[in-house]
Amino acid sequence: MLLTDECPRYEVDTLSAARPAAPVDPVNVEPKEWVYEQYDQLVLSRTVRRPGLDAAVLRLRPSWRGLAVSLDGPPLGERDPFAAGVQAVLDAARNVACAGGEPLALTDCLNFGNPEKPEIGWELGRAIDGIAAAAEALQVPVVSGNVSLYNETDGRAIPPTPVVGCVGLVPDVREVPRGWSPGDAVLLAESDGTLVGDAGLIRFVWQAAPRLSLAHDVSDGGLELALTEASAWSGHEFRAEGSARLGSIVIACAPEHKDGLGWPHLRALGEVA
């Protein structure tokens, strides 16, 4: 039995506030470097991979092990708060995996309006259910969290915004993917679209990371933006036509490693020139 099993459960009035699908706001895919670059990225000189693509990595001296750290909150809350909770967890875990880390723990921050209003109570409950479903699929615990409620202006609530942080263990920071190089094969790793499939893809990527030169998840903006971001990070441009579902992962490796990766859902995109 866990201590949380004896915690009281609060029942609030709820009212579905589902909204029709809407296109992604272009503002959401603009670079955010101007925000996080204001903060010290080299605390105690342990940073071996700076933020900017998926997750940052800190070395755990004196060993060569490291911590991969990521924070994510996809802008899906107004459309579907359950999906927002699910994707916040999966995005954060994918980011950690792309940096070579095994996701080990989650923390959340739930930002909502007044939960005493039935529609806000419904949004909050659905987001929590989404976080729980994804965490269970990953078998990764939510070990902490906080809430920011009653966020309203003139009676109008902020969009439901679940944010999730993930930390993971990197076995050897010397094997963290650094960026693709000319001649590398670029592939798209996909899942079957289920939570179990997404969890399996995340496991595959962090286990394969020592053989990869780069891994980067497909999120807001689709495949084109993912390739653009990976190109900028690596310093070598690569483009490919096509589309990819949310949660797919672009990976790159030396050609001799391509056939031995062992994931059943791989699609070749090309080779870095």
Task: Give the positions of each predicted feature.
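Glycine-/charge-enriched secondary-structure boundary and capping motifs
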Residues: 1-24, 124-162, 202-273
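Well-ordered alpha-helical segments embedded in enzymatic catalytic cores
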Residues: 84, 88-92, 200-204, 226
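Short, Lys/Arg- and Gly-enriched loop/turn segments at beta-strand edges
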Residues: 192-198
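Glycine-rich phosphate/pyrophosphate-binding loop regions near the starts of catalytic domains
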Residues: 25-192, 240-242
